[in-house]
Amino acid sequence: MDVELCLKEMGRRIMERRKGMGLTQEALAEKSDLTTQFVSYAESGKRGMRPENLMKMAEALGVSTDYLLTGDIIDKDKLLLSHKLDRLTPRQVRLVESIVDECILLYGGENL
């Protein structure tokens, strides 16, 4: 995918999320500590942004930078859990998995 198309897609995601939150460009600019002109350019896909501005925008919109860049939704709770699992031994991970499977069974889900 070329850069211009990526920027346009990212801009579309920013605009959709902003509107979904009921924010104006001005309100998003204030919330993200960026200028209204910057938000406008970002939404139009006319400009890329530095990583620190991408992070500000994502935080203000309550989404991950991955979502803005690619459209992939990463639930922050799942990401946090994943980081915690990385600190466990393989045996401990299997134990956590069995506990999760039991919870799924108890609450009507399928045993994965």
Where would I find each of the regions flagged by the language model?
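Short amphipathic helical patch at the helix-1/turn junction of helix-turn-helix
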Residues: K8, K19-G20, G48
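DNA major-groove recognition helix of helix-turn-helix/homeodomain DNA-binding modules
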Residues: E52-Y67
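Interfacial/linker helices and their anchor residues that mediate assembly or domain coupling
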Residues: I74-L112
